[in-house]
């Protein structure tokens, strides 16, 4: 991983892999999620498929700069494109998870000429019950948020670990739980500024 300074003066932590001549795949994490969200095996598979891969940490994540003042998703999108401009002038592929998916979708409004594709994962619309019924969709179980908001990170990994692991086990469902991977990912949330793990609360 390395640090890159943007035109705006903000420094982001990034990792770029693969051959410079290959099409660029930009992996955009969700709010507060580190670039480690994108597992190395997934990155390797993309490289083997002919992509150059860019992973990065948003501000307030990893070793990227930390900010106490609030900001909008538009700021994150602008910084993402400043970063992309340093590596690729051709159209790129964006794959985003959660907030990262929204960043890709919003980019389609005024950056269509810079995009080869956009893939949004777990970035669905906000709908009321009537709209779910109209589309014949099943709404999220209300108890899901109840479990997740029980986790209130303090910025201290030792104190917070049990809450994170409870959340990961819940989200994992009935699939075999990879505790080693979950622990490594949780530790990645606390890299850099100790306030990073509270980014969802702060912003």
Question: What label would you give each PLM region?
Answer:
Residues 6-66:
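Conserved HGGG/HGGXW glycine-rich cap/lid loop of the alpha/beta-hydrolase fold
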Residues 139-203:
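Alpha/beta-hydrolase
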Residues 118-154:
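Flexible "cap/lid" loop of the alpha/beta hydrolase fold
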Residues 90-133:
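Conserved hydrolase catalytic core segment
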Residues 74-92:
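Conserved acidic catalytic loop of the alpha/beta-hydrolase fold
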Residues 1-4:
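A domain-start/cap signature at the N-terminus of enzymes
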Residues 65-77:
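Catalytic nucleophile-loop/oxyanion-hole region of alpha/beta-hydrolase
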């Amino acid at each position: 991983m390395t640090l890159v300074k943007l035109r705006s003066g903000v420094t982001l932590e990034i990792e770029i892999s693969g051959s410079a001549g290959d099409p660029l795949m930009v992996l955009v994490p969700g709010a507060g999620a580190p670039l480690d969200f994108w597992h190395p095996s997934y990155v390797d598979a993309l490289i083997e498929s002919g992509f150059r891969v860019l992973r990065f940490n948003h501000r307030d994540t990893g070793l990227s700069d930390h900010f106490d003042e609030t900001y909008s998703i538009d700021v994150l999108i602008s910084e993402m494109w400043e970063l992309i401009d340093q590596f690729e002038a051709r159209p790129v592929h964006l794959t985003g998870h959660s907030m990262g998916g929204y960043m890709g979708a919003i980019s389609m409004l005024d950056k269509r000429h810079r995009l080869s594709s956009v893939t949004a994962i777990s970035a669905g619309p906000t709908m009321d019950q009537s709209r779910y019924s109209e589309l014949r969709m099943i709404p999220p179980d209300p108890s899901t948020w109840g479990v997740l908001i029980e986790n209130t990170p303090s910025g201290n990994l030792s104190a917070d670990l049990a809450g994170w692991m409870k959340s990961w086990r819940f989200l994992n469902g009935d699939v075999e739980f990879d505790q080693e991977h979950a622990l490594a990912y949780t530790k990645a949330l606390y890299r850099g500024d100790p306030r990073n793990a509270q980014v969802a609360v702060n912003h």
